[in-house]
């Protein structure tokens, strides 16, 4: 029986402060009920061991007794239910966060971030599996991540999810109604999920963390209403309101158009955190002045994408100028630079904005985006082109814009396979999974001598070089004399 694992889980909850000693009997009985057990014999000792090991034992036992199906989705739904029993109620969490915020906003977010890991909402043991490294490029050190923390669904689970009834609740993965939700085959459980109310621009928003943590304290700030993404004056106001309340965090918004936006356009949200991306470190390569806003520092950032950086001690002035630039960009056409505000009534121009505090001043980075497509580039002219799709085909959203590549899990095994062939020989084109990398690998072999000792590191740096090219493709005005001249034409038109 799993009595020891139950006792170990209670011990874990006590050590992490999820429950107190007076909660022990109540929590034990709730766990027994969920596990389908009518009684238990508490062991005399508590073993301090990793949460992953405790939960695995409980899941294996429940599956063996027929309490749950033994597939990844069912196991994730069930262990979240177990952890939800031990997770304090929202009122308790909010009260503790606000108490700490009164002392220091950073103390509050530090506590909440650790809490979200202790509840297993952020599965530390899965995040640790991600492959992460930095790659030196002409634009600074870019961050590369092969995301392995999202569980791979097995074919049976995928089929079951497809056959399951489509519910309209919660409306999406970002809705506040996910807090405490039991989940289903096609929607993750969130009994251990907690969100913190924040007011920005007189609206009710909520702070939470991403369960996949692409970077340190990767947070999501979500609208309390299920409303679509929209970039406008209010967006700039909200971003600056947020960094005013949490000055140790940056925050940004994905663009509001397909191709150049993120994966979720249906729910208005921002992403932020406590991390310094390569784009933030990038210097201003040319200062510019916007007429009527001489009090605002402005310049073009040395970055592969087209970035205007604004800085001022008065956040209201930043909002005014950012709106001015956005309005101008939405209506801007420059045929010589292949920039079209719209074609056939479809708008193409928008902005990816990022806000932060720097040396006591407010700072806004405005990244100019355009989602036009052509026969030659059906996925987008300012999107990674076909020759880069073997590494990155997905949308270039906020996180990538700032210099962090979130790459698909398939690359873990594929890069290992490419390394083997580069070191020991072989024909990549004869392997269905690796054939897509063949042209790239042949080009690399002409420049490097690969050995068992250096292959992994060389490939990592070359993946970084590909990502730098991805960002160059996504840049509207290129880092060439002609591109910078076109960039200045837009700035002078504002």
What are these regions (language model features)?
Residues 217-223, 261-277, 363, 367:
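Histidine-centered divalent-metal-coordination microenvironment in nucleic-acid enzymes
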């Amino acid at each position: 029986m799993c009595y020891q694992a139950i006792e170990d889980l209670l011990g874990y909850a006590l050590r992490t402060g999820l429950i107190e000693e007076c909660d022990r009997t109540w929590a034990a009985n709730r766990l027994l009920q969920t596990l389908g057990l009518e009684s238990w014999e508490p062991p005399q000792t508590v073993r301090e061991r990793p949460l992953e090991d405790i939960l695995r034992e409980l899941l294996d036992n429940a599956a063996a007794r027929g309490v749950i199906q033994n597939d990844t989705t069912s196991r994730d739904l069930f262990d979240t239910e177990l952890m939800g029993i031990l997770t304090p109620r929202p009122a308790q969490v909010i009260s503790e966060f606000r108490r700490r915020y009164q002392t220091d906003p950073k103390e509050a977010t530090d506590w909440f971030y650790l809490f979200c890991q202790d509840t297993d909402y952020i599965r530390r043991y899965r995040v640790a599996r991600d492959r992460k490294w930095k790659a030196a490029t002409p634009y600074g050190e870019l961050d590369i991540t092969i995301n392995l923390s999202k569980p791979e669904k097995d074919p049976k689970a995928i089929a079951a999810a497809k056959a399951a009834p489509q519910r309209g609740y919660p409306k999406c993965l970002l809705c506040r109604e996910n807090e405490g939700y039991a989940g289903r085959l096609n929607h993750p459980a969130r009994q251990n999920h907690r969100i913190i109310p924040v007011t920005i621009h007189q609206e009710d928003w909520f702070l939470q963390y991403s369960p996949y943590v692409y970077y340190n304290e990767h947070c999501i700030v979500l609208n309390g209403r299920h409303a679509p993404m929209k970039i406008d004056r209010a967006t700039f106001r909200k971003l600056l309101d947020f960094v005013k309340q949490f000055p140790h965090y940056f925050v940004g918004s994905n663009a509001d158009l397909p191709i150049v936006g993120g994966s979720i356009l249906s729910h208005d949200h921002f992403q932020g955190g406590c991390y310094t991306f390569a784009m933030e470190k990038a210097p201003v390569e040319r200062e510019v002045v916007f007429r009527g806003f001489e009090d605002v520092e402005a310049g073009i950032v040395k970055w592969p994408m087209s970035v205007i950086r604004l800085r001022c001690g008065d956040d209201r002035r930043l909002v005014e100028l950012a709106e001015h630039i956005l309005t101008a960009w939405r209506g801007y056409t420059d045929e010589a630079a292949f920039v079209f505000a719209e074609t056939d009534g479809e708008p193409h121009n928008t902005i990816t904005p990022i806000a932060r505090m720097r040396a006591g001043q407010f700072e806004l980075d405005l990244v100019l985006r355009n989602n036009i497509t052509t026969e030659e580039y059906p996925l987008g002219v300012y999107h990674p082109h076909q020759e880069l799709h073997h590494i990155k085909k997905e949308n270039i959203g906020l996180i990538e814009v700032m210099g962090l590549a979130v790459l698909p899990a398939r690359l873990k095994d594929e890069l290992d396979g490419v390394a083997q062939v580069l070191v020991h020989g072989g024909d990549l084109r004869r392997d269905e999974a690796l054939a897509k990398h063949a042209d790239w690998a042949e080009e690399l072999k002409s420049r490097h001598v690969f050995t068992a000792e250096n292959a992994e590191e060389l490939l990592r740096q070359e993946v970084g070089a590909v990502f730098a090219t991805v960002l160059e493709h996504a840049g509207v005005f290129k880092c060439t004399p002609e591109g910078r001249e076109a960039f200045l034409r837009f700035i002078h038109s504002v």
